[in-house]
Every structure is written in structure tokens, then in C-alpha cells.
Amino acid sequence: MKQVTQWFVEQGWQPQAFQKECWKAYTQGLNGMLHAPTGSGKTYALWGAIIQEAFHVKKHPTGIQALWLTPLRALAIEIQQATQRMSSDLTPELKVGLRTGDTSQSERFKQKQKPSFGLVTTPESLHLLLR
């Protein structure tokens, strides 16, 4: 988790214990549930592990590799911005898309033609994607 930890330092932050635990569990292939207060860094606890793994891959597979479901559009926007921020700094070639009911037809078409590495979406939008 060297690159992600360094990214935190560059932001003027220190990883929280629960974030480090999540990163470790992810690298060990474990599943779990994360419960922490609003604004405590849950997004980076999960995305940090995903990006760290991607950082070491020489050739990234095409298509969506990480799907993030959230029930609220506003939260989806915040998560997409946070995950893209980290991705842009550590793995600029990996994009994080956003798909909600507000996504334009032209953007949906682009997403279909060239899927991003990560996609943040709502259950309703995922349902429409899978139809």
C-alpha cells in the first residue's frame, strides 16, 4: 500500500486504522462490511485497495473492473469525484465513470463504447444497464 499511503501523505492526511485494515483485508482476498461515520474516509478505505492493486498491473483489462453501487445520486457524484481524484493521481489511465438517471444520452453512448475502469452508479441505473 506504499503508493496509496504516499498519496495520503501528499494530501496532508494520515490513513486511519480502519482504512489500513480494509486495505490489508482486500489484499488477502477477504470480504467484509465497512461501517464508519460520515466523512471519515470510507471511500478511500475501499478505493485505495482497488487502485493499489491496479497500480501494479502492467496492462489493464478493458471494461468495468470495479462497480460501486450507492442508493443516492448526490452520493454517487461525491464518490465518483473522490475515486477519480485518487485514480488520476496514481493511475491516470484509469477512469471512473458515473451513471445515474441524470447521465445524458451522449455520455451513456460513450460509456457503452469505451467503459471506464470503475463505474459509480445507483441501483436503478444498474438495472437499466443490465436490461
Residue ranges and their predicted role:
Residues K2-R131:
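Conserved P-loop/Walker A NTP-binding site and adjacent catalytic elements of P-loop NTPases
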